[in-house]
A protein has these predicted regions:
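Hydrophobic alpha-helical transmembrane segments of multi-pass integral membrane proteins
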Residues: 1-281, 289, 294-299
Length: 299
C-alpha cells in the first residue's frame, strides 16, 4: 500500500470515523456508546496493518479492525429497528454505518495478498479509502444536511450519494460503463451536497472560521468530483484521462482533506454552537386538598 493511500486511510480510521459518529443524533442502540468511545483502540491495529509488510501479522491486525467495522455495520439494522424510518436522511446515515465494513473486508484481503472476488491488490487498496470517505463521510454529511434542510435538493443528495457509492461498487463486478453510471449518480449527489453546504454557509454559519471551512469543503468538492467523473469516463470510452495513481493523488487527497476534514470540522463547530433546547417544564401538580368542616345538620 502506497504512502499516500496509507496516510489517507490512517486519517479515516483514527479521526474521520469517530468524529463522524459523534455528530449523529437519534436513538442509540445497545453498544453504540461503547463502540464509539473505543473506536480509536480498534483503529490502532488497523493503522499498524497499513504500514507493516503484507504478512500473517498484518492480516490479523487488519482482521481486528474489520471486526470493529462489522460491529458498526450491525448498528444499522439496530438503529432501523428503533427509528422505523427510511426517510432520505436516515438512509444516508444507515449507509454511512455500513460502508466501513466494505473497507475493512478489502483491507484484510489486500494485506493477505488475496485477490478478493478477482480484484487486483491495487483496486482493493483503493477500496479502503473510498469506503471511509465516499461511503462513510460523504453519506454522513449528506444525511446531516438533509436533517438540517429537508427540501428536494437535500433529499436528492441523501439518496443519490449512497446510491452512487453502491453503483460504483457494482460497477467493479460488471464493466466500466456500469462504473461510469455510478460515478455520474455519485457526482450529481455530491454536487447537491456542495450546493447545500454553500447555502448552509450563508444561512447557518455565523463565525468566519466555520464559514471558511464550509466554503472550502464545497468548492473542493466541485473540482474533485469532476476528476473522478473524468477518470470513469476515460476508463469507459478510452478518452485521455489521468491514470489511477494521479486520480488517487488529486481526487482522493482533495476529497479527504479538502472536503471531508473541512466539512466534519464545520459541522462539529455548528453542533457546538447549536442552542441547547430549554428543559421541558415540570408537570403541574394538583394543589393539596384542604379539609372542609362538615356542614350536615345533626339528626
Amino acid at each position: 500500500m502506497s504512502v499516500l493511500v496509507g496516510s489517507v486511510v490512517t486519517l479515516g480510521m483514527f479521526w474521520v470515523v469517530p468524529t463522524g459518529l459523534a455528530l449523529l443524533d437519534g436513538p442509540r442502540p445497545p453498544g453504540w456508546d461503547l463502540l464509539r468511545r473505543s473506536w480509536p483502540l480498534f483503529a490502532v491495529p488497523g493503522g499498524l496493518a497499513l504500514w507493516l509488510p503484507r504478512s500473517g501479522l498484518s492480516t490479523a491486525l487488519a482482521a481486528v479492525y474489520a471486526l470493529a467495522t462489522l460491529a458498526l455495520a450491525l448498528q444499522a439494522p439496530a438503529r432501523l429497528f428503533l427509528t422505523r424510518s427510511l426517510r432520505p436522511g436516515e438512509v444516508a446515515v444507515l449507509t454511512a454505518l455500513v460502508a466501513p465494513s466494505v473497507a475493512g473486508l478489502a483491507l484484510v484481503a489486500e494485506r493477505a495478498a488475496h485477490p478478493l472476488l478477482g480484484f487486483d491488490l491495487d483496486i482493493l487498496a483503493l477500496t479502503v479509502p473510498h469506503f471511509h470517505f465516499a461511503g462513510f463521510a460523504a453519506a454522513l454529511v449528506a444525511g446531516l444536511l438533509c436533517r438540517a434542510s429537508d427540501g428536494p435538493t437535500a433529499r436528492f443528495a441523501a439518496l443519490s450519494v449512497p446510491a452512487g457509492t453502491l453503483l460504483v461498487l457494482l460497477g467493479y463486478f460488471v464493466d466500466d460503463w456500469a462504473e461510469l453510471a455510478g460515478a455520474i449518480v455519485l457526482t450529481a449527489g455530491m454536487t447537491a451536497v456542495a450546493f447545500l453546504t454553500l447555502r448552509e454557509r450563508r444561512e447557518t454559519a455565523t463565525d468566519r472560521v466555520t464559514r471558511g471551512l464550509l466554503a472550502v469543503s464545497a468548492l473542493v468538492l466541485f473540482a474533485t468530483m469532476l476528476l473522478a467523473l473524468s477518470w470513469a469516463l476515460g476508463e469507459a470510452t478510452g478518452l485521455p484521462h489521468l491514470d489511477l495513481t494521479w486520480t488517487a493523488a488529486t481526487h482522493g487527497l482533495g476529497n479527504a482533506l479538502g472536503f471531508t476534514v473541512c466539512a466534519l470540522l464545520a459541522h462539529r463547530r455548528l453542533r457546538s454552537r447549536r442552542p441547547t433546547p430549554p428543559a421541558p417544564p415540570a408537570p403541574a401538580q394538583n394543589p393539596p386538598r384542604t379539609a372542609h368542616p362538615r356542614t350536615e345538620l345533626p339528626t
